[in-house]
Regions:
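Glycine-rich adenosyl-nucleotide cofactor-binding module
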Residues: 1-2
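Left-handed beta-helix
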Residues: 5-6, 11-12, 17-18, 23-24, ...
Length: 62
């Protein structure tokens, strides 16, 4: 099950893999697909339609 902090903004159409974490103030936009065990750091931005594989880390404010 993905873990999303309350202050993060994840679009309803985004897909988050098992074990993925989205931290405070991060954004994951429409149609984005994140694999398993990914980390989206504080304040990071994942744009519309972006695809990330498994075990990826997007650093804070990236």
């Amino acid at each position: 099950m993905p873990r999303v902090q309350p202050s993060a903004d994840v679009a309803d159409s985004a897909q988050l893999g098992e074990g993925t974490s989205v931290w405070h103030l991060a954004q994951v936009r429409e149609g984005a697909v994140l694999g398993e065990n990914c980390i989206v750091g504080r304040g990071a931005y994942v744009g519309t339609g972006v695809r990330m594989g498994d075990n990826c880390k997007l650093q804070n404010y990236a």
